[in-house]
From Swiss-Prot:
Protein's name according to its UniProt entry: Teretoxin Tan15.2
Keywords from the UniProt entry: Cleavage on pair of basic residues, Disulfide bond, Secreted, Signal, Toxin
Naturally occurring in which organism (per UniProt): Terebra anilis
Keyword Nucleotide-binding: no
Signal peptide, first to last residue: 1-21
Keyword Disulfide bond: yes
Superkingdom, natural source: Eukaryota
UniProt feature coiled coil, ranges: none
GO terms for cellular component: extracellular region
Amino acid sequence: MTRLTVVFLAILVLLPLATSNSGADEAPASLSDLLHRTKRCAGGNQCTTDAECCGNYQCRCSLASNCSGSNPKKRCT
């Protein structure tokens, strides 16, 4: 086979693999990400949004003094 034929065949084989929509291009969550999310699922852990809290927990300021400033300290409650 000529080089051109080999390149053409390689493209035919690899093109469907590169364009498949199997979700393989999504990076798996790292162990540290999973642990970080798990820690926030318990009540009382720090958060920035309700999405970081599990179940019926909501991200709220525990004290009014914690809510002032540009970096409020919130917890899942």
